[in-house]
Amino acid sequence: LKHKDPEDEIVILDDSSDQRTWRVFDRFIHDKSNNIKLVERALEGNFSNQKNFLNEQCTGDWIVNIDADEIPHKNLISNIKSLISANPDIELYWVPRINTVDGLTEEHINKWKWNINEKGWVNFPDSQQRIYKNCKSITWQKPVHERLVGAKQDSYLPFEEIWCFYHHKKISKQEKQNKLYASL
């Protein structure tokens, strides 16, 4: 919230939070000056449907889609609006993502055919379609490993840490996610 401008809207789509998470939500959503909207909807095995539903809840001109386990670099947040203003023809930005996994072994790396750089980042830059114009022609496709379609022009942000999302998890969560994705 400290990097959010007063006119910015935050829309949280919750598909299965526990009471502890709800207590955190509760601290923020009741203060209308925060401009936070909380919407609940079951995942039902399709990430694109979930993200398209989320898009329908957003009222701004642009959407910055951040997964619950991602944190944007403060430079990225501070410069999004000037980036968009300076490039009026771009409708979609690919954001590089820094993935780190606690407990990752050589066996995991080989099994999943991952690349690890000298900083321990997994598959960097792992660019994700995360900043995009809020319009009906831009929609998410595919139930898992979803992709946006419909943008007339896109651009990649620089593959530098200051333009990244941080995405950290433990190996147990990664293994659980891999099983879920394989089942969809």
Can you describe what each PLM-predicted range is?
Residues 67-71:
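The conserved acidic donor/metal-binding loop of glycosyltransferases
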Residues 63:
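Short aromatic/hydrophobic "clamp" motif used to bind/position activated sugar donors
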